[in-house]
Amino acid sequence: MSFVRVNRCGPRVGVRKTPKVKKKKTSVKQEWDNTVTDLTVHRATPEDLVRRHEIHKSKNRALVHWELQEKALKRKWRKQKPETLNLEKRRLSIMKEILSDQYQMQDVLEKSDHLIAAAKELFPRRRTGFPNVTVAPDSSQGPIVVNQDPITQSIFNESVIEPQALNDVDGEEEGTVNSQSGESENENELDNSLNSQSNTNTDRFLQQLTEENFELISKLWTDIQQKIATQSQITPPGTPSSALSSGEQRAALNATNAVKRLQTRLQPEESTETLDSSYVVGHVLNSRKQKQLLNKVKRKPNLHALSKPKKNISSGSTTSADLPNRTNSNLDVLKHMIHEVEHEMEEYERWTGREVKGLQSSQGLTGFTLSLVSSLCRLVRYLKESEIQLRKEVETRQQLEQVLGDHRELIDALTAEILRLREENAATQARLQQYMVTTDEQLISLTHAIKNCPVINNRQEIQASESGATGRRVMDSPERPVVNANVSVPLMFREEVAEFPQEELPVKLSQVPDPPDNMNLAKNFPAHIFEPAVLLTPPRQKSNLKFSPLQDVLRRTVQTRPAPRLPPTVEIIEKEQNWEEKTLPIDTDIQNSSEENRLFTQRWRVSHMGEDLENKTQAPFVNLSQPLCNSHSNTQQSRSPTFSEELPVLGDGQQLRTNESLIQRKDIMTRIADLTLQNSAIKAHMNNIIEPRGEQGDGLRELNKQESASDMTSTFPVAQSLTPGSMEERIAELNRQSMEARGKLLQLIEQQKLVGLNLSPPMSPVQLPLRAWTEGAKRTIEVSIPGAEAPESSKCSTVSPVSGINTRRSSGATGNSCSPLNATSGSGRFTPLNPRAKIEKQNEEGWFALSTHVS
């Protein structure tokens, strides 16, 4: 690489041109976005402008006016003797207290308005309310918590209501004026004396006025006369001051401070010339015009020196001409003002009901001062009276608040008591509602039990049973046979009745020794001791429960008295081990008693008597053997609960209903006993009719006996209580059924007569099996009990009596002693020779049939 100098100035040959630099495109300036940087939103509204103007207006015009007077007086006091200082000082304090209070009050009100406007959110509005507060009965704390006032509010109130607040404001303003004036220490001491003088209370100020009023006025007048005399000696007789009268001088007294201030200002400029008093007075009365002239003079100082003689002459001439009118107008204004004050005082006195004092005529400044002082005295007196009245009102208010607090506590206590009573009432209503529900349930269950429990009785039989008749004979017609009420009772029934304690029986039984077989039961026992002859399906003993006394009596009745052929039902097979399970512990009996009672009430249904004889003879039968007697004796103590177990558990207040139900139960038991006697009497009468026929009519007599007994006998579960309406209906139905039974009995008697005429003995459609009773053999008692859960189709279907399931319950030889057939034999051996002998034995032992049971 070679370094060759090349001439830059020469032409470039073969040199490649440099590419032009591209200029950057200037970005287009965006337009002014008024929505983002618009400052018109910050422009002051007209209301803001007005408020700013009001804020920046000068409010010290009157203060400046008094400041000028004070400065002039201070300069004068330094030159005068100390004797006159006290007089001028008092005069100045009086003028300040009388004339400057209005301006100071306005300033104080403005400041207080600003303070209240700034602090109005600290004290929100409070509304009196009566809260619904309930206090506990034993609480010592009050129901309403009183909120204490904030600390700021109390401080603010103390600062506003402080009596020295106005004077403090005056002192601050005067202190600022003195600091701006820059006078000597004597002036500061004088200001302090003025401040202390202005800070005196109103009462002390009034006392000073009353003591020194006359002395002060006399000194003022002497001072004024001396000034007039000195000025008249100095000035020539042709000056306008000679035209001034005493009234004009009095008019100028209100502006004495301004006059002295102007004199002190004009003395260095016109030391050689004397100033006319008329000019000074005109300057004071027309302060605005004089200020404008002074401003013009300050702007043109050269012209001011040349025009001084002309100005003095012209101003003196104008003021001398207008002075009487101005002084008169000033006095009129003062008189008008004092008249307004006295008029306002008079209206206030009328409004408050005080004595109205007449207007006082004032002449000059003396009357003006006296009227003001008297008005102030009256105002102070009225303020004292209003303060006393306000204190009385405050005391009365406190007393009323205390009484109100007592009343509120009483109201809270009453409210708590009312709430407690409401709670008790609600609890009582809940218990009453529950009691009503349980009562309704009991009534419903009782109604169902009554509907399922017909009573076969009439009023004549009730009266006969109550009178204690043991036997009766019913004679419907001369053709009808006599019904004998003397019937025999089986030994088994008598033995088990004797086994029951007296208090455990549902109906009180008279315990008598066992009568012989040939004695009549009606003569030994009352009518109401017999249990009803019922056709009830006994409950299946599926558990180890024991029967209640009433249920046990009904069960024994079914066991000891076999029934003849009955209407169509479902056969129920009972096994002997079900009855032997009763010997289990008593605890299981207590635990399952409710289930057993429920099964007992559900399975024992009411029989209906209106079925035909053909349907009655088609029902299958169940042969139930009698359980062992020793099992009864072993479990007698476990099966002896009180009769109250049969009743439902009653709630509070149902003792009366319990008594009524017991009375009705006793009445029903008496009716059942009467029906049993009637049934036995009818059977006995039928047996008496059938016995003369001999052995050839055994089967037919058995059939007739079964049919008549099934027609005339009606059994049902014992109801707890019956309503009067249903009782009347039941009695009417039972009377009707009794008439039907009697009609059927007559038909059977006629059939017996017809059968007796026939030579060939009729055979019974259903043969009773013969059983041989030996000492070591087993016994069998046939009892036909229809099933409680038979379907309705069994009424229409024809079932052969032979096809019925016959079950035999056998017991060991130990039960022979309790057998109703073996109870009378000493050796325990009894073997019936033929069916007739067996039937006769059954008639002697008091066998009776169970009525039909139709589900």
UniProtKB/Swiss-Prot annotation:
Positions bearing Phosphoserine: S640, S644, S760, S764, S819
Identify the GO cellular component terms for this protein: centriole; centrosome; ciliary basal body; cytoplasm; intracellular membrane-bounded organelle; plasma membrane; spindle
Q: Where is the composition biased (Basic residues)?
A: 291-311
Q: Which GO terms describe its biological process?
A: cell division; metaphase chromosome alignment; mitotic spindle assembly; regulation of centriole replication
**Residues in coiled coil:** 325-437, 725-751
UniProt region (Disordered), positions on chain: 166-200, 291-328, 790-834
By what name is this protein known?
A: Spindle and centriole-associated protein 1
Write the lineage as a comma-separated list.
Eukaryota, Metazoa, Chordata, Craniata, Vertebrata
